[in-house]
Amino acid sequence: MAKTFYVVVIVLCLGFIHQKAYGVYMQKLSDKKLCADDECIYAISFGRAEDDYNAPDCRFVNLKKGELVYIYTKLVKENDDAGEFWSGSVYSDQYRDQQGLVGYFPSSLVTELTVYKDELQELPTTAVDFYCD
């Protein structure tokens, strides 16, 4: 009985030690971001997609022309050659009471309709900001 107990404990311990991570850390799009608050959980603004956008990888979100978008962060453009990206989620009745899929998209594709917060906080980006599940 005691031998079985020790075998079970060892197997459980090995199971906790050997955990797999399925996410992928992708290249950072920027070193700084602008947010409405210090945790970047409140929306900066609300906008409308002016054109379709197909996400090139898991960091980005698909947009369809006319969709409404909540904007949560604005990445700080590092140089003139770099694109300017915002992160947000598409508004739909399905996600009325919860936040939908959040991802990046080019800022040139979305027109802000309502700005909730004018004074934004500049914060450093982290690897988690560009993490793909």
Swiss-Prot record:
Belongs to the MIA/OTOR family. It comes from Aquarana catesbeiana (American bullfrog). The lineage of its organism: Eukaryota, Metazoa, Chordata, Craniata, Vertebrata. This is Otoraplin. The gene is OTOR. Its main location: secreted. GO terms for cellular component: extracellular region. Disulfide bonds join 35-40, 58-132. It holds the Pfam family SH3_2. Residues 1-23 form the signal peptide. It is found in: Secreted.
